[in-house]
Structures are given as structure tokens and as C-alpha cells.
């Protein structure tokens, strides 16, 4: 028997589709169904590496965890990773197939319809229910003929759609009605209900609006979800402007850590765990501060989807000089993936993998050289920190080979790669340990490594060490999500929409 399906679409980006999808995944998992998530096409530089080395969006990996299953590439068969304002690396079934402009991708896209359909059908054959997430809005007139993620997917099997609107942004009734008006009659018929998301205050104040909406559209409101602070769910796409547009003041009673906000930053979720630490203030730095401002306790160069371009940006923006000033004043400096490459002396791109720039000088804080290669390394790893034996679990996503000088000790020893026992060095550290880099994304998610490193920074301040923090587990977050469905959705209407087994 083919699986049932339900689809979550939205009136726009950032209205809560990913969270609602995860909540439905967890709710139906707790109801005893075998559930899987699906998103036909995702655009994000925050990716996840599956056990077999494929790349998918992190949101689908999180949703799979909510379902109690391992993520596979079929859950997100097409992933677009922007490498510039005009081009993206196209990843199909977990593997890169090339870098394309929007026009090139639109010409290529018809080949992906069957990939999306086959992936959805494979999941449908294996699970009782597939919870499908759309992207952006289904009513983008200029993009509808290229659709492989919204109504085109819903129409493949007549999947019922729930439309989500964000009342916190204002104008939610106009967004919901306007979105419906821009759909054709077949698409409108697939929309079964609305969700009003991120409501604050007395819900009875919405009663008149809900009655009007239901009468106007002849569609029911499935539920009104409250605004929930600090769900501890990773951002699917770019870092929200709220995190960097208004600079946070330095807190002298806490560790102040600065992440350089590169134009093509990737895997910014690497720093979410740091941000949740009670003794840390995390700052995203988009421009060089004035010379008299106090210096941080740590500067981090993050991953980049376009390392050569972002290295050029560091120089043109003055941030390279700022990092050098921090280093000269004995501030520790760390680099993750592309940031690790930038810390070296030289970056070479003889094949033009990243750009037309064949050679660039790095920041010169570590004695190492990187050569970009055509083959992309994507693998899940287990490792331990050299000298401290803190275990970390993470993943590598890069297209470069870095050769540190023999005198530089490695930062980590990788002990397992895609489930196979190995023994190889990763990263490098300066002789005094003040500058270090690694190819491993997710190292700060390891509680003991994170706390031991933060305690080393605290020691530099003359402060006592702290124990590892008890961050909310995924299970706790999933329970919160399932409770949102149980407490705020019309259960009878939800069962009617999903249908009988």
C-alpha cells in the first residue's frame, strides 16, 4: 500500500515551514506511524552529510531525527548551495553535478523532475506517511514554470496541503488569502487548511479574523501556534539579520567570541552550541571595528562556499587587518573548513574549481598550503582532539587538500570515517596552540571539547573553569514540537486531512 502524504507550504520564507514539518513528523511518529520527511529542492549552505557521504539540507536531517530514522539523500534530492549572487553548486542525490547560473539551472531543471518524483515514491514505498515541506511561497509567479518543490510536488499524487502564515510579521490574513488567489483552481483545491504561526497574546482576539478567513476561503484553520522562544533548532538558511545587524555590546563578565561574517559563509550552525553557553556572548562581525574597541576572547573564521572570494573580501573590508591585530595582541584565532584554509600561507586553484584566481596569499597565521581539487570530500567522522582526547562527531565538506608544515601538530585525529575505522590527522595548530584550524564541521557540538576549550579561554582571563552545560537534548526539543501539535491543532481535522491508513 502506498503511503499517505501531507504537505506544508508557506506564504513566504521564514514563516515556520521547517518547524511545522518537524512537529508533524514527531507527532505522527509518537502516534506509532513510520514517518519520513521530504523536500524536493532546498537552497542552503547549511548542509548535512549522510552516512553514505551524501549532502542534504540540515532541516531534513533534523526532521528525520524527529521521525526516529537516519537521513538519506532521497529526503532532499536536490540541494542548491549558493557560491555567489549569480550561481550555485547543484547537488543531486547527495553528489555535486556542477556550478550553474540561474538560467543554466532552469535549463537543466527538467531532468530533475523524475529525480524528485522517484525519491518521493521511494520514501512512500518504505513509510506509512511522508511529511513534505515546500519552499518559499507557491505563489511566486515568475518561478512557477520551474517548480519542483511546491505545488508541482503536491500535484504529483494529489497531496493535501496545509498553508502556514506568520502573524508575527503582520498581515497574515492578506498573505493567506493573497496566496490562495494566485493559485490556479486545481492548486487551491489541494489546500485543505491554514496554520497561523507565531501568535503572541490572547488567542480569543483572533476569533473574528479566523471566522472571516474561513468564510472567505471556505478553508479551515487547523491551528494557531504560539510564538516559542529559543526552540534550539538550527537555522536552515542564512544567519538571520537580527543576529548581526545590531552589534551586541561586549560583556566583560563573559567570553566574547567573534565569528567573521563572510559573504559566502557556510554551515553557520557550527556556532549554535557556543551561542547557547551561559558564559559566552557570540558576535557576528560583518565589518572591521574601530581601532579603539576592545578585543574579543576568540576570533573564528567560519566555513565558506567561495573561499577565494571571501579571502578577497577579508582584505578589501579591513577584516584581514583586524584578524592580524587580534593575533598580534595574543587573541586566539580558529578556522573551520574554508576558514582553516584562509589561515594558511597560500591557496592554489590550478583547475579553476573555485574561481579564475589561480593563487592567493592566505592570512599566514599557520604554515600550510591548500590546493583546490575537483573531487568533493563529504564524509561523517569521529575524532579526538590531540593532547586532550576529547571526542567529537562531525562531518567534512570541502574541495581542497591542505598540507601543513611538518612542524605543526594536528588539531584532531580522525578515528572513524563513514563508519570505517581509520587513523589520520586533521587540521593544524600553532606551536603555542593559540591558532588552530580543522576541516571538521560540528566540533563545538561536542560538550566536553566545547567546554574544555572555553575553560582554556576562561583560564586566560583568570577565571575558574565551568562544568559542561546541560544543553537541551534533541528528544526534549522533539517533545516540545509534538506538544505544539497536540495542544494547538484540531486533531479531528488533521486526521481527516491525512486520511485513514
Segment roles from a protein language model:
Residues 355-379:
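Conserved P-loop NTPase catalytic core
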Residues 1-325, 332, 370, 374-375, ...:
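Flexible phosphate-sensing "switch/lid" loops adjacent to ATP/NTP-binding sites
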Residues 337:
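Catalytic nucleophile serine of serine hydrolases
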Residues 320-325, 348-364:
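An internal, acidic/charged active-site-proximal segment
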Residues 344-345:
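Short glycine-enriched nucleophile-adjacent loop
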Amino acid at each position: 500500500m502506498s503511503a499517505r502524504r501531507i504537505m506544508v507550504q508557506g506564504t513566504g520564507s521564514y514563516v515556520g515551514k521547517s518547524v511545522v514539518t518537524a512537529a508533524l513528523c514527531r507527532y505522527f511518529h509518537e502516534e506509532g506511524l513510520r514517518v519520513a520527511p521530504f523536500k524536493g529542492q532546498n537552497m542552503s549552505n547549511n548542509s548535512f552529510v549522510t552516512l553514505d557521504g551524501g549532502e542534504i539540507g540540515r532541516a531534513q536531517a533534523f526532521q528525520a531525527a524527529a521521525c526516529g530514522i537516519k537521513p538519506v539523500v532521497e529526503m532532499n534530492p536536490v540541494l542548491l548551495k549558493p557560491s555567489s549572487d549569480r550561481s550555485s553548486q547543484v547537488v543531486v542525490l547527495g553528489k555535486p553535478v556542477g556550478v550553474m547560473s540561474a538560467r543554466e539551472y532552469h535549463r537543466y531543471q527538467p531532468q530533475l523532475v523524475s529525480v524528485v518524483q522517484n525519491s518521493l515514491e521511494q520514501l512512500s514505498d518504505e513509510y506509512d506517511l511522508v511529511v513534505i515541506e515546500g519552499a518559499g511561497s507557491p505563489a511566486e509567479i515568475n518561478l512557477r514554470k520551474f517548480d519542483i518543490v511546491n505545488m508541482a510536488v503536491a500535484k504529483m499524487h494529489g497531496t493535501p496541503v496545509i498553508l502556514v502564515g506568520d502573524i508575527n510579521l503582520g498581515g497574515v490574513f492578506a498573505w493567506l488569502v493573497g496566496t490562495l488567489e494566485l493559485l490556479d483552481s486545481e492548486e487551491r483545491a489541494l489546500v485543505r487548511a491554514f496554520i497561523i504561526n507565531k501568535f503572541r497574546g490572547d488567542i480569543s482576539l483572533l476569533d473574528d479574523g479566523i471566522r472571516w478567513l474561513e468564510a472567505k476561503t471556505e478553508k479551515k484553520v487547523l491551528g494557531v501556534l504560539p510564538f516559542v522562544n529559543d526552540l534550539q533548532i538550527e537555522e536552515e538558511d542564512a544567519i538571520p539579520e537580527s543576529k548581526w545587524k545590531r552589534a551586541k555590546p561586549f560583556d566583560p563578565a563573559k567570553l566574547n567570541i567573534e565569528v567573521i561574517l563572510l559573504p559566502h559563509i557556510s554551515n553557520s550552525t557550527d556556532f549554535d552550541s557556543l551561542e547557547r553557553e551561559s558564559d559566552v556572548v557570540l558576535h557576528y562581525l560583518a565589518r572591521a571595528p574601530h581601532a579603539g574597541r576592545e578585543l574579543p576572547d576568540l576570533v573564528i573564521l567560519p566555513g565558506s562556499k567561495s573561499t577565494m572570494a571571501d579571502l578577497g573580501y577579508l582584505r578589501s573590508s579591513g577584516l584581514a587587518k583586524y584578524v592580524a591585530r587580534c593575533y598580534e595582541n595574543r587573541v586566539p584565532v580558529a578556522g573551520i573548513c574554508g576558514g582553516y584554509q584562509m589561515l594558511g600561507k597560500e591557496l592554489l586553484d590550478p583547475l579553476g574549481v573555485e574561481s579564475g584566481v589561480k593563487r592567493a596569499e592566505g592570512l599566514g597565521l599557520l604554515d600550510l598550503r591548500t590546493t583546490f581539487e575537483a573531487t568533493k570530500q563529504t564524509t561523517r567522522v569521529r575524532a579526538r582532539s590531540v593532547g586532550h582526547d576529547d571526542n567529537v562527531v562531525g562531518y567534512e565538506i570541502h574541495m581542497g587538500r591542505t598540507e601543513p608544515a611538518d612542524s605543526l601538530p594536528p588539531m584532531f585525529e580522525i578515528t572513524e570515517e563513514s563508519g570505517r575505522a581509520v587513523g589520520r590527522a586533521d587540521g593544524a595548530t600553532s606551536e603555542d596552540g593559540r591558532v588552530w584550524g580543522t576541516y571538521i564541521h560540528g566540533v563545538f557540538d561536542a560538550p566536553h571539547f566545547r567546554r574544555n576549550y572555553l575553560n582554556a579561554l576562561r583560564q586566560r582571563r583568570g577565571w575558574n573553569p565551568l562544568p559542561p552545560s546541560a544543553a537541551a537534548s534533541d528528544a526534549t526539543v522533539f517533545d516540545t514540537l509534538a506538544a505544539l501539535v497536540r495542544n494547538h491543532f484540531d486533531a479531528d481535522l488533521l486526521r481527516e486531512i491525512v486520511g485513514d491508513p
